[in-house]
């Protein structure tokens, strides 16, 4: 069970005259790599989608539903995944989640040829496999975020969480290059098989090295533990008993802050999934960009993410110190969504490809950056059961990710891509208004 940290020996608490070890940052690094791999696995079909669509003769609407299947599975299992982490331990649940999404990433390569799935048709085969893959990935980010609550003190938490989520940006940068190169040399199926193998190795590393709590890790010395616990609301006392953190669901669902987080995340993830699913195809078919250049340009929103997410984590911490958590977190999100919405609108109306793609990429990076503040706020308002809270918030966000490729295809087919991106800009602004419901300085319990 992922309980409060176990009792700490008195000697380990008192002997803090050592140079602190940095195991917590090794854990954050592994979790950031995991976050990056999840996004490579999500983006691979968006990049390989052109080839899949041509081979199996899928129209845009069918492809939109296949893209959406992943997000639907992702939405369905976020809350159970977070609850399982709270109940049975982050390490076990995270390892199982990584193995699940890695295995089904590999299965994507052969889905239509499997006896059971093949009988349903190619479209259903891909959709089912992507749905199950989404189930596996659903637990990964909320469980990783829960680990942040235990492994980092409050003063480091926003920055550490931003590094963790910047792994998403690194994965987004790597995906078009790695997947594009693999497809050109070995075909689209190879990218799924290789990524499945990489995920299996990463799952084994995390199971071996990462623990639920820093107290359990043999490499953490007393000074590092004191640094973590000195600013943590969930740190132990020497004689603390071990109790299960039961989630007060009635308080959670009656909390305006929780509803604000869910609505805001839904609206932030909607435009993000345009970049995850349709951006490569948009560049090739609408903007007329050559495939090799499109592979590189597809990385642009995630390059922006790589720099903007840590910056927004730092800004969020500084704003919270100066303005208080409620006003500081809200101001940081509003800065991101206002700029993102403006750039989405401007980019969709710009004819020059270089300027247009640069604006759209910056908009995508700002959406990622603003969303990182939401994860920190989950720990602000409910650190003891942040796995469940993060899972609930991300369930709503994933519904935005499910709707995004389907509705975007429908709007683009009927009215054109300019309107599809303008609508995404409007949705982004709504995410900012949801923050008037959120009180980051008040715990739910």
Write out the residue ranges for each language-model feature.
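Helix-loop-helix hairpin linking two adjacent transmembrane segments in secondary transporters
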Residues: 168-217
């Amino acid at each position: 069970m992922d309980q409060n940290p176990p009792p700490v020996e008195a000697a380990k608490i008192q002997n803090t005259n050592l140079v602190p070890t940095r195991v917590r940052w090794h854990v954050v690094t592994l979790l950031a790599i995991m976050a990056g791999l999840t996004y490579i696995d999500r983006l691979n079909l968006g990049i390989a989608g052109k080839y899949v669509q041509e081979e199996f003769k899928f129209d845009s609407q069918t492809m939109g539903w296949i893209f959406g299947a992943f997000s639907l599975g992702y939405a369905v299992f976020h809350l159970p995944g977070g609850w399982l982490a709270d109940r049975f331990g982050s390490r076990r649940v995270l390892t199982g989640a990584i193995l699940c999404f890695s295995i089904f990433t590999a299965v994507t390569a052969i889905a239509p040829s499997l006896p059971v799935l093949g009988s349903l048709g190619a479209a259903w085969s891909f959709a089912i496999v992507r749905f199950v893959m989404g189930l596996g990935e659903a637990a990964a980010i909320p469980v990783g975020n829960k680990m942040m609550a235990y492994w980092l003190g409050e003063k480091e938490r926003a920055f550490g969480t931003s590094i963790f989520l910047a792994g998403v940006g690194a994965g987004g940068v790597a995906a078009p290059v790695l997947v594009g190169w693999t497809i050109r040399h070995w075909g689209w199926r190879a990218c799924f098989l290789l990524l499945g193998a990489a995920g299996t190795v990463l799952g084994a590393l995390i199971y071996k090295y990462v623990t639920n709590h820093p107290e359990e890790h043999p490499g953490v010395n007393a000074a590092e533990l004191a640094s973590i616990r000195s600013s943590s609301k969930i740190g132990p006392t020497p004689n603390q008993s071990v109790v299960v953190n039961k989630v007060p669901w009635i308080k959670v669902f009656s909390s305006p802050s929780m509803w604000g987080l869910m609505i805001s995340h839904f609206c932030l993830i909607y435009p993000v999934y345009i970049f995850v699913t349709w951006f490569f195809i948009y560049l090739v078919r609408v903007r007329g960009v050559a495939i090799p250049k499109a592979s590189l340009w597809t990385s642009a929103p995630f390059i922006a993410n790589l720099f903007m997410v840590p910056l927004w984590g730092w800004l969020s911490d500084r704003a919270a110190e100066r303005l208080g958590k409620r006003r500081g977190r809200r101001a940081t999100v509003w800065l991101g969504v206002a700029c993102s919405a403006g750039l989405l609108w401007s980019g969709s109306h710009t004819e020059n490809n270089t300027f247009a793609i640069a604006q759209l990429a910056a908009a995508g990076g700002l959406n990622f950056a603003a969303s990182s503040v939401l994860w920190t706020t989950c720990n602000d308002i409910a650190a003891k059961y942040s796995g469940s809270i993060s899972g609930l918030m991300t369930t709503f966000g994933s519904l935005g990710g499910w709707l995004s490729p389907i509705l975007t295809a429908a709007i683009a087919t009927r009215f054109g891509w300019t309107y599809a991106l303008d609508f995404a800009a409007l949705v982004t602004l709504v995410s900012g208004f949801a923050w008037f419901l959120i009180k980051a300085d008040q715990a739910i319990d």
